[in-house]
């Protein structure tokens, strides 16, 4: 497959040490050579070499650059690729790009370089999606999962499962078309059932990693809830190590939702500091309280903050009811003051959920809280070096659909349905798994996926 030659700025816009303009396509080297001036021509350069020179426009030097030449097929796109390393900035870099476009290159669409890598067989679709996961990774663990997926861990597993299904379908066809025994139908059903159970077990095992994988990829929507002035904003500031929320002794200071990402021992949290939940006549505060209730309902995880220096109130107990059904940690704050809280009642309300004591003004208890969060979600098993995690929502949905199709095969065999009918569900499972790797996928989906990438990627 051959495309036109595309160009784009691959580094973020703005001032910086360097900026990279990337070209890919059959004319990439020739187009770059038209504007690059040095001792030797780029057209004669060997692959994977770097060259110093200048970019000129109408005889005027507009940039001093280093140019990398990479010839097909040993490139990311499997096309000729040129990367121009210029000084970071806006004006000169855009002039270089415009010069390339005037000399025959077309401006790349978002994600077009990665899309070409997929279409040219350099990577499959799950590996292409992992590129974006790596870019967006917020923790070392999320980065590790993305790198393993880019390396083909998930692809190899899916392809092995598809091969198992294909082998079974081929055997079904042989047994139907060339029966040698009277009991061929029974033998075929038994073989098909064994293969189905094998593939189904693997799909179920993959889906068991989905919850942790999704956490790593997207982060946990974490609502910090509690009555006014119990220390919610102090907790947010301590976790992100930055003064984002106003902290005062005046109840009701936080009137809107504040969101921040933080990495807590490998667990990515999207922290949501909510307005204190209480009955109020203040119109503005009332809006904040309603938003807090919605944030609580939508949260994946809750940090329920109580003031250890005050007695438990009806409003506090109502928060436990609202948190029911969620994963949550109870934070008993202000341990530097006299304890007035009924701790036994708190333990009764919290049930199996962890309870951590803190004195945020004295920086005490934060490590214990971070450890409780890590243990609650990962319990250490996420660290397996070669583990394959499913984190992409699209992949998870396709695996669930494939599992449903495989269950249909099992049910059909158990009901005594003919194998040529049962194999329809088997073929559907094969197709669905193929959508994960891109072996069977619609062009519209490809456009939708790659448009999520930035320009130059």
Curated annotation (Swiss-Prot):
Binding sites annotated in the UniProt record for K(+): 229, 248, 250, 253
Domain TrmE-type G stretches: 219-378
Molecular function terms, GO-annotated: GTP binding; GTPase activity; metal ion binding
Function: Exhibits a very high intrinsic GTPase hydrolysis rate. Involved in the addition of a carboxymethylaminomethyl (cmnm) group at the wobble position (U34) of certain tRNAs, forming tRNA-cmnm(5)s(2)U34.
GO biological process entries: tRNA methylation; tRNA wobble uridine modification
Family of this protein: Belongs to the TRAFAC class TrmE-Era-EngA-EngB-Septin-like GTPase superfamily. TrmE GTPase family.
Primary location class: cytoplasm
Taxonomic superkingdom: Bacteria
Record text on subunit structure and interactions: Homodimer. Heterotetramer of two MnmE and two MnmG subunits.
NCBIfam families: mnmE_trmE_thdF, PRK05291.1-3, small_GTP
InterPro entries linked to this entry: G_TrmE, GTP-bd, GTP-bd_TrmE_N, GTPase_MnmE, MnmE_dom2, MnmE_helical, P-loop_NTPase, Small_GTP-bd
Species of provenance: Listeria monocytogenes serotype 4b (strain F2365)
UniProt keyword Chaperone present: no
Binding site for (6S)-5-formyl-5,6,7,8-tetrahydrofolate: 22, 83, 122, 457
Protein name: tRNA modification GTPase MnmE
């Amino acid at each position: 497959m051959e495309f036109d030659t595309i160009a784009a700025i691959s580094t973020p816009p703005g001032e910086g040490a360097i900026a990279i303009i990337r070209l890919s396509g059959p004319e990439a080297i020739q187009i770059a050579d038209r504007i690059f001036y040095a001792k030797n021509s780029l057209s004669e350069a060997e692959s994977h070499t770097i060259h110093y020179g200048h970019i000129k426009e109408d005889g005027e030097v507009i940039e001093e650059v280093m140019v990398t030449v990479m010839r097909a097929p040993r490139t990311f796109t499997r096309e000729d690729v040129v990367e121009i390393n210029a000084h970071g900035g806006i004006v000169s870099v855009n002039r270089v790009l415009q010069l390339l476009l005037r000399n025959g290159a077309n401006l790349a669409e978002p994600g077009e370089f990665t899309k070409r890598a997929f279409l040219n067989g350099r990577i499959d679709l799950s590996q292409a999606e992992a590129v974006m996961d790596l870019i967006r990774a917020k923790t070392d663990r999320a980065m590790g999962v993305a790198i393993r997926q880019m390396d083909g861990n998930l692809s190899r597993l899916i392809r092995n499962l598809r091969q198992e299904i294909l082998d079974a379908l081929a055997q079904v066809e042989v047994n139907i078309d060339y029966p040698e025994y009277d009991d061929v139908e029974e033998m075929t059903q038994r073989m098909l059932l064994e293969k189905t159970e094998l593939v189904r077990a693997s799909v179920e095992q993959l889906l068991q990693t989905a919850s942790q994988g999704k956490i790593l990829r997207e982060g946990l929507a974490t609502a910090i809830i509690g009555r006014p002035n119990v220390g919610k904003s102090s907790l947010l500031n301590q976790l992100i190590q930055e003064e984002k929320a106003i902290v005062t002794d005046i109840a009701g200071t936080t009137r809107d939702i504040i969101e921040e990402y933080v990495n807590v021992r490998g667990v990515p949290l999207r922290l949501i500091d909510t307005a204190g939940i209480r009955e109020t006549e203040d119109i503005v505060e009332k809006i904040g309280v309603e938003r807090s209730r919605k944030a609580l309902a939508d949260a994946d995880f809750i940090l329920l903050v109580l003031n250890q220096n005050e007695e438990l109130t009806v409003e506090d107990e109502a928060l436990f009811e609202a948190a029911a059904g969620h994963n949550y940690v109870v934070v008993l704050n202000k341990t530097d003051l006299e304890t007035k809280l009924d701790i036994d009642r708190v333990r009764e309300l919290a049930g199996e959920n962890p309870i951590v004591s803190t004195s945020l003004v004295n920086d005490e208890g934060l490590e214990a809280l971070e450890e409780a969060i890590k243990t609650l979600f990962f319990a250490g098993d996420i660290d397996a070096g070669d583990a394959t995690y499913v984190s992409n929502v699209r992949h998870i949905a396709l695996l669930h659909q494939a599992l449903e199709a495989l269950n249909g095969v099992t049910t059909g065999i158990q009901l005594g349905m003919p194998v040529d009918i049962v194999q329809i569900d088997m073929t559907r499972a094969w197709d669905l798994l193929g959508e994960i790797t891109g072996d069977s996928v619609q062009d519209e989906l490809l456009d939708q996926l790659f448009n999520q990438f930035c320009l130059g990627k």
